[in-house]
Amino acid sequence: MAFRRAEGTSMIQALAMTVAEIPVFLYTTFGQSAFSQLRLTPGLRKVLFATALGTVALALAAHQLKRRRRRKKQVGPEMGGEQLGTVPLPILLARKVPSVKKGYSSRRVQSPSSKSNDTLSGISSIEPSKHSGSSHSVASMMAVNSSSPTAACSGLWDARGMEESLTTSDGNAESLYMQGMELFEEALQKWEQALSVGQRGDSGSTPMPRDGLRNPETASEPLSEPESQRKEFAEKLESLLHRAYHLQEEFGSTFPADSMLLDLERTLMLPLTEGSLRLRADDEDSLTSEDSFFSATELFESLQTGDYPIPLSRPAAAYEEALQLVKEGRVPCRTLRTELLGCYSDQDFLAKLHCVRQAFEGLLEDKSNQLFFGKVGRQMVTGLMTKAEKSPKGFLESYEEMLSYALRPETWATTRLELEGRGVVCMSFFDIVLDFILMDAFEDLENPPASVLAVLRNRWLSDSFKETALATACWSVLKAKRRLLMVPDGFISHFYSVSEHVSPVLAFGFLGPKPQLAEVCAFFKHQIVQYLRDMFDLDNVRYTSLPALADDILQLSRRRSEILLGYLGVPAASSAGVNGALPRENGPLGELQ
């Protein structure tokens, strides 16, 4: 090989020297007189230089092609002796080595029977991890790319050495231990899935008793060879899982499945159930049962708060009666606000909602309470519009007209029909004012149309233009909705008249570019939501009886209105003699802000 390289370089040098001597030969042959008479233009010089350079390039290319042809002729006889079906040993080793799942950075516990996120888990197993330095993948790539077995074997050992150096420099022993435990957990999950799939196949392929009665000859036949192999594999897998569980208990697992339910029960102060006591027992007795292979996801799904009594810090007779009505399906609701109001479950929310409805019904039978809630609503919106530097005159006129219409008994039947068409299932103060008007308005402001956001986020438009455009959009929407009303002069029509003054202010406050107005609107929303959360909290109000709950809601309303109106700079609606303190047996309200 060295002789060939020397021969090739000598030929290249001879060719280059020959081309370089051409100008010298021409000069010595024709003499200086001929070249002195010949004048070369710059263009002709470029042509001559390009011609010489191209000639050299063609010569080099031809020489290189000759060398490749010689190599193919020499390699052909050597490869002819090998069999086509054989594969080099390093490639087989690299393929036979089981590759560990690399996506261990995202830890999750999955049930073998659950079908959710199977596609995602497959993608994550294909995708290389950030910290992946697996010697198997590196070795397989080097073995396939290498042309000789010795080079592949050396690449395998080099890859292992590279992995060891990378892992030792990547983190300390503790982090490596955690990574190993995570990979061990993932291996356990895969083994559990394999066992569950095998058990499903066995259950699907087992003959029925009536089939054995019909065909006694076939029933008495021994198991076929594939079935016996499957059974033997399942037994080996069970023993492997049994050893793996004991190994996990010995060294401690990152996600103990048995203690998770017990810790959750201690947190919620729930009594120990039969399932939790069974999980406390040794796994040897229940190794072949499906309970051994429950994942943490199934444990959380099986633990539903509605199946257990909710922990009560004090007696709540009214709440317990309402909870019984909820279980019977006698408490309707338009929209579930379980998460927003911090309830344990939907049943908990519906039971408290039933009590709150009845409490407001008893409160509003008193004329003074009607005046109080009407005055508080008027003052809150007036203070909000004053903070936004808007005149509240038009709002006050529309608000008084809506109140006078709503307080007339002859309009209640029409109002009920209108609100039932909007999904309101109960004619209570909570369902109409707090839920249908306020909470729906906050939800609409959280998801504004894209066209409105495009105008408000345009840097080239002034704030006044944005405010005018937003107000025009609100008015046009309300005008279009007014045309579709079932009752042209009903409660919804009066509500739209109020919204024409309030909606642009709220929309520009929540979505506009003014930070001071946005802070005021955010505080307004926070107080309303916190007022409802306190109302649905067993520790802040008494659910012992409906009169006690009504009294606590009234005191809570006075306290919250004082906080909000004081922030807006408006005198409080409550008199000086009422300070909003709750009775002693109810406990302190604490800081409500």
From Swiss-Prot:
Task: Give the domain of life.
Answer: Eukaryota
Q: How does it assemble?
A: Homodimer and heterodimer; forms heterodimers with MIGA1. Interacts with PLD6/MitoPLD. Interacts (via phosphorylated FFAT motif) with MOSPD2, VAPA and VAPB.
Concerning its family, UniProt says:
Belongs to the mitoguardin family.
Phosphoserine is found on 132, 220, 224, 228, 276, 295
Q: Which residues carry this modification: Phosphothreonine?
A: 206, 273
Q: Name one GO cellular component term.
A: mitochondrion
Record motif FFAT, residues: 292-298
Renumbered residue ranges of the record's region Disordered: 103-141, 196-231
User: For this chain's UniProt record, which GO biological process terms are given?
Assistant: bone development; mitochondrial fusion
Point to the regions of Low complexity compositional bias: 106-116, 123-141
**Cell location:** Mitochondrion outer membrane
Functional summary from the UniProt entry: Regulator of mitochondrial fusion: acts by forming homo- and heterodimers at the mitochondrial outer membrane and facilitating the formation of PLD6/MitoPLD dimers. May act by regulating phospholipid metabolism via PLD6/MitoPLD.
PTM summary from the entry reads: Phosphorylation at Ser-295 of the FFAT motif activates interaction with MOSPD2, VAPA and VAPB.
Q: List the disulfide bonds.
A: none
Record's protein name: Mitoguardin 2
The regions listed as transmembrane in this protein's record are 11-31, 42-62
Q: Which PANTHER family does the record cross-reference, listed alphabetically?
A: MITOGUARDIN, MITOGUARDIN 2
Note on domains (UniProt): The FFAT motif is involved in the interaction with MOSPD2, VAPA and VAPB and its phosphorylation regulates these interactions.
Membrane topology is:
Multi-pass membrane protein
